[in-house]
UniProtKB/Swiss-Prot annotation:
The protein's name: Leucine--tRNA ligase
GO molecular function annotations of the record: aminoacyl-tRNA deacylase activity; ATP binding; leucine-tRNA ligase activity
Gene3D superfamilies: 3.10.20.590, HUPs, Isoleucyl-tRNA Synthetase, Domain 1
Renumbered ranges of motif 'HIGH' region: 40-51
Species of origin: Bacillus cereus (strain G9842)
Length: 802
């Protein structure tokens, strides 16, 4: 008889909730374990089967650690600000807050139905004013430290929608919603100076237990480069511009310069003859995103300004072009071009027939660019030097002549932190009529997002908050000075940068987190989530954590000690699950048909946790069949415990049991859940063959399967006669001595060829081995004379006979 998953799951979920079984203990004597999931955005679509994969992994670890005597922090919450709720509100006229609350309730119910051991008393919601009070508080600290500042930044402006769009909301230069044209225009934006932390963000990666591929993604994003800044005067004017180059040794090979179309000098230096062409090009570029502009494969475009720069090292005049592959927001917005020795410059020079000059020997620049090392030529005082020597000598020359200086730069840009949206955290700053600005006082936080019917974009580029006069307009009670609140809101990243800290102390109204509690719980021991957040979310969270470390709020330099990216669950056809393809599997349906334990077991058994694997109904059915086999082995049709279960030991199962405890314990700890489950299947096969089942082994097995299939685990535990939950029962321990093989397989050879294999005691003497071997190959050596018998104890017997 199989078990009734609906009854069992309902029963134990009710028990856990009523008894607050998974409440986090704050006592200090136990070792701690903090298992964190990337909290979900509560979308209208609800949970899909991809979510529970990571959640089940952290849940297995949390449940095992509790049984191993750890105090465990395993929380859940909601990353609930963001664009979809705002779009829904615009489309339906409902409030984004109501929509969000409804979605959170759906998500919470779905997650509870899967039996995860979360401490629901610690639930956080980024849209709760009691939560975002502290998001705003962190902003004030960034502002005080000079890490939050206002700047003019080119943004994606969509005139038809009257709003600024993120890069992700644009497809082929048009808005994703409605297909309206998008242009680049400068706007006043809040920026966070993440670049000030570039070196620390890079260096501290070495101390983390993260996948190397993920660390490399962060290293590349930060993109530290060493080189030099070089100053170029503009011929016939007092103006100059600066370029950064990693190859100052090739300065003698520069044949032209390129400025970003948005560069401040372009309008000033363009000649009358070139004005029309330059303006037309600038207007065309406004329609392109940074991503499109910097694609390596795209055809190079550009226009000559009519102006010339003077090469500081030899006085040569270099034509100044503008081209879209140079970004005003990246580096200095200007580059010196050495087409003989740089891939992009070579392509550009080839398109516009610009001169090339070889300054490093080793290639044939009439055929292709040469980027390797070699002796310098045509370079005056650098001639004959290799790359490293020439770079050092050129930097020395630049600094002595004040024509430049040594410089380290980062690919990392400061973080554009403002959004022209309603549904986000208000930025706690006031702009006064006299041009000054001040932060809202700490005691006035949270600055609550005002409720409004009108969340349509303002049309001016400001957020919809600009429409709410009674909220925006303020008067200083002391001076009578008039001011306007900041109308931009924070990006969705803000609330997710620090949520792992709030779980430690979710109801504290006096501080972001209690210093004693944070000391007790940090760093997070394991953080599991999708690889799509490998760069931005993790980089931003590490940045905020380091700022909080500098001001004494957190005791560790890094937030997440170990990180793991789960793979993706694909549709049965190996394609990504999506509504449009109609291949989305809803976990609610599986819980109803097969049970939560089956879903959990199946997702962990599909393959390695970091692999992307196709969903399979057959695999799901197989997982259910295994749980049914476990149930039938231990429980009779009448619901009583099987009569095979006895207090007496059973020698034949001893080794299999201890092997299973060892493998499951090690595999769970290393996140190899699929192989742990395989081992449990092997044990169940052995147990079916055994005459009797020692109660100790049955209890040990139930404890091992409970983290994967907790409802069945609890039900079997209660059938074994326990009134308490299995949650805090002690984890089984294996005996190393029981794993040692008593018997070994011996190979028997005649004249070096294998003729038989024998099983015998591992302690058999040479004489016993020889005797048993000769008996086994009697027919092979009949009529031959045995010349010699070579015995290797525990392994092999080789008979020489002719």
């Amino acid at each position: 008889m199989s078990f009734n998953h609906q009854d069992i799951e309902k029963k134990w979920q009710g028990y856990w909730e009523e008894n607050k079984t998974f409440r986090t203990p704050d006592e200090t004597e136990k070792p701690k374990f903090y298992a964190l999931d990337m909290f979900p955005y509560p979308s209208g679509a609800g949970l899909h089967v991809g979510h529970p994969e990571g959640y089940t992994a952290t849940d297995i670890l949390s449940r095992m650690k509790r049984m191993q005597g750890y105090k465990v922090l395993h929380p859940m919450g909601w990353d609930a600000f963001g664009l979809p709720a705002e779009q829904y509100a615009l489309d339906t006229g409902n409030s984004p807050a109501e929509f969000t609350e409804h979605n959170i309730n759906t998500f919470r119910n779905q997650i509870k139905s899967l039996g995860f051991s979360y401490d629901w008393d610690r639930e956080v919601n980024t849209t709760d004013p009691n939560y975002y009070k502290w998001t705003q508080w962190i902003f004030l600290k960034l502002f005080e430290k000079g890490l939050a500042y206002v700047d003019e930044v080119p943004v994606n402006w969509c005139p038809a929608l009257g709003t600024v769009l993120a890069n992700e909301e644009i497809i082929d230069g048009k808005s994703e919603r409605g297909g309206h044209p998008v242009e680049r225009r400068p706007m006043r934006q809040w920026m966070l100076k993440i670049t000030a932390y570039g070196d620390r963000l890079l260096e501290d990666l070495d101390e983390l237990d993260w996948p190397e591929s993920l660390k490399d993604m962060q290293r590349n994003w930060i993109g530290r480069s060493e080189g030099a800044e070089v100053h170029f005067n503009i011929d016939g004017t007092d103006e100059k511009f600066t370029v950064f180059t990693t190859r100052p040794d090739t300065l003698f090979g520069a044949t032209y310069c390129v400025l970003a179309p948005e560069h401040a000098l372009v309008a000033e230096i363009t000649t009358a003859e070139q004005k029309e062409a330059v303006e037309a090009y600038i207007n065309a570029v406004k329609m392109k995103s940074d991503l499109e502009r910097t694609e390596l494969a795209k055809e190079k475009t550009g226009v000559f300004t009519g102006a010339y720069a003077v090469n500081p090292v030899n006085g040569e005049k270099l034509p100044i072009w503008i081209a879209d592959y140079v970004l005003a927001t990246y580096g200095t917005g200007a580059v010196m071009a050495v087409p003989a020795h740089d891939e992009r410059d070579y392509e550009f020079a080839s398109v516009f027939n610009l001169p090339m000059k070889e300054v490093v020997k080793g290639g044939d620049i009439t055929k292709e660019v040469y980027t390797g090392d070699g002796a310098h030529v045509n370079s005056a005082f650098l001639d004959g030097l290799n790359k490293e020597e020439a770079i050092a000598k050129m930097i020395e020359w630049l600094e002595v002549t004040s024509a430049g200086n040594q410089k380290v730069t980062y690919r990392l840009r400061d973080w554009l932190f403002s959004r022209q949206r309603y549904w986000g955290e208000p930025i706690p700053v006031i702009h006064w009529e006299d041009g000054t600005m001040t932060a809202v006082k700490e005691e006035e936080l949270p600055l609550v997002l005002p409720k409004t019917e009108n969340i349509r974009p303002s049309g001016t580029g400001e957020s919809p908050l600009a429409n709410i006069d009674e909220w925006v307009n303020v008067v200083d009670p002391e001076t009578g000075k008039k001011g306007r609140r900041e109308t931009n809101t924070m990006p969705q990243w803000a609330g997710s940068c620090w949520y792992y800290l709030r779980y430690i102390d979710p109801n504290n109204s006096e501080a972001l987190v209690d210093p004693e509690k944070v000391k007790q719980w940090l760093p997070v021991d394991i953080y599991i989530g999708g690889a799509e957040h490998a760069v931005l979310h993790l980089l931003y969270a590490r940045f905020w954590h380091k700022v909080l470390y500098d001001i004494g709020v957190v005791p560790t330099k890094e937030p997440f000690q170990q990180l793991f990216n789960q793979g993706m669950i694909l549709g049965e056809n190996n394609e990504k699950m999506s509504k449009s393809k109609g291949n989305v599997v809803n976990p609610d349906d599986i819980v109803a048909s097969h049970g939560a334990d089956t879903l959990r077991l199946y997702e962990m058994f599909m393959g390695p946790l970091d692999a992307s694997i196709a969903w399979s109904e057959n695999g799901l059915d197989g997982a259910r069949r295994f749980l049914d086999r476990v149930w039938r082995l231990f429980v009779q049709d009448n619901g009583e415990l099987s009569e095979k279960i006895t207090d007496a030991p059973n020698k034949e199962l001893e080794k299999a049991y201890h092997q299973t405890v060892k493998k499951v314990t090690e595999d769970y700890a290393e996140l190899r859940f699929n192989t742990a489950i395989s081992q449990m299947m092997v044990f169940i096969n052995d147990a079916y063959k055994a005459e009797t089942l020692p109660k100790e082994y049955v209890e040990g097995f139930v404890k091992m399967i409970a983290p994967v299939a907790p409802h069945i685990g609890e039900e079997l535990w209660s059938k074994l006669g326990y009134n308490e939950t299995i949650t805090y029962a002690s984890w089984p321990i294996f005996d190393e001595s029981k794993l040692v093989e008593d018997e070994v397989e011996i190979v028997v050879q005649v004249m070096g060829k294998v003729r038989a294999k024998l099983t015998m005691s591992k302690d058999a003497s040479k004489e016993e081995m020889e005797q048993l071997a000769l008996e086994a190959i009697q027919d092979q050596i009949e009529g031959k004379t045995v010349r010699k018998v070579i015995v290797v104890p525990g392994k092999l017997v080789n008979v020489v006979a002719n």
